[in-house]
Amino acid sequence: MEMAKEQELILVLDFGSQYNQLITRRIREMGVYSELHDHEISIEEIKKMNPKGIILSGGPNSVYEEGSFTIDPEIYNLGIPVLGICYGMQLTTKLLGGKVERANEREYGKAIINAKSDELFAGLPAEQTVWMSHSDKVIEIPEGFEVIADSPSTDYAAIEDKKRRIYGVQFHPEVRHTEYGNDLLNNFVRRVCDCKGQWTMENFIEIEIEKIRQRVGDRRVLCAMSGGVDSSVVAVLLHKAIGDQLTCIFVDHGLLRKGEGDMVMEQFGEGFNMNIIRVNAKDRFMNKLKGVSDPEQKRKIIGNEFVYVFDDEASKLKGVDFLAQGTLYTDVIESGTKTAQTIKSHHNVGGLPEDMEFELIEPINTLFKDEVRKLGIELGIPEHLVWRQPFPGPGLGIRVLGEITEDKLEIVRESDAILRQVIREEGLEREIWQYFTVLPNIQSVGVMGDYRTYDHTVGIRAVTSIDGMTSDFARIDWEVLQKISSRIVNEVDHVNRVVYDITSKPPSTIEWE
């Protein structure tokens, strides 16, 4: 991954821990740039990256399992500080001549350690709570190492070779359950690796703009804009770098939220004076979706049609050499490490044609989602746009269960607008990770005035989450839910019932389709 030479880097090597991205994020929160790479990275690549420190992540394997993950032991001879976490500590012990064995019982959960070190534990109390998760245990440390923390269950909760600046901890400092975990990581990054913490969004913008200008020169760039946070930030960053050399194509497939298409044109076309081509393709999409009720088929049709529409418009433009995409660092990690696992396929509108002869520009592919939001604020994008709700590529097409019709889309569009308005008025928009309405393929009997009705049911989905991988339903106050329900049944035609989804993820997903 491209990186400014003067930028401090902490390299995290991935051994399959569910917390590996968290390590990277914790370090970035300290103002120090960090990247996650596969454990099989070569010594030559590491030297080229010139990291200030290396962290070996945890992992689910035993160091003695056949085919278990390992590293080139030469890493320990580079003169770069190394911190091994759980599996990383066990692997370090084994590779440097110590002994590791299977524990009688897997140690999982909170534990109390007694620490002593003027480096890793500097300024921290001796007794502290940590989070353990391991099935192997160290029984003999390598030559040159000493114990710097123990616990009731192990004599080797943390070890160090101070001369070579190699450290190991048998717990996870990156998780919130570890009482002083952030402080320990900060000690490693600042005290041991001597990082100054100068990585900011302001610096990121300066570096990226210079990289974009050098690469693009006087050529032109095309950007597929959806109005979502990622594509919006990419477009504004590129526009700041190259101005009118950027052209954005906004495909309006007719499956957007209320007023969304006009908002994109107003905020970005007029507000940022960007060159945006709006393609009204609603009829084209609706014709393709007619009679289709299977969710996977709907998603595929929407994705494919988006590609065809974009391709048609792109072919009308001459002299375009680059295509910009809002790829995030999580996408890079999932596609770039052997140990990564995709929990769920995402709702991104399908990939663009392979035969499109463009060079790719992905200016935010080193950032996590929360960092992209910070970047957006730094670029001057209004907060209400930066903090917009995540919206799937197929749009309302997967929030109308079953066949999509204009009438059903209007019900979802209007009910969703009411939900968002009330949530905003109640000041809950930052407390709830995601909230939206869905239209199940359900009708029920009701009474409105003196008349019997047989109309649609609207479902409300609102969840709290940290990263979207797991979530819980939001505990919205009953009076607020009543207000939302009352407004929907009174203001949206053909709705006589509102229900609230109280399912967590897992077992359900956040979206209904």
UniProtKB/Swiss-Prot annotation:
ATP binds at S226, G227, G228, V229, D230, S231, S232. SUPFAM superfamilies: Adenine nucleotide alpha hydrolases-like (SSF52402), Class I glutamine amidotransferase-like (SSF52317), GMP synthetase C-terminal dimerisation domain (SSF54810). Residues 9-198 form the Glutamine amidotransferase type-1 domain. It is an enzyme of class 6 (ligase). Pfam families: GATase, GMP_synt_C, tRNA_Me_trans. It catalyses: XMP + L-glutamine + ATP + H2O = GMP + L-glutamate + AMP + diphosphate + 2 H(+). It comes from the Bacteria. Keywords: ATP-binding, Glutamine amidotransferase, GMP biosynthesis, Ligase, Nucleotide-binding, Purine biosynthesis. One of its GO terms (cellular component) is cytosol. Catalyzes the synthesis of GMP from XMP. Homodimer. This is GMP synthase [glutamine-hydrolyzing]. It comes from Staphylococcus aureus (strain JH9).
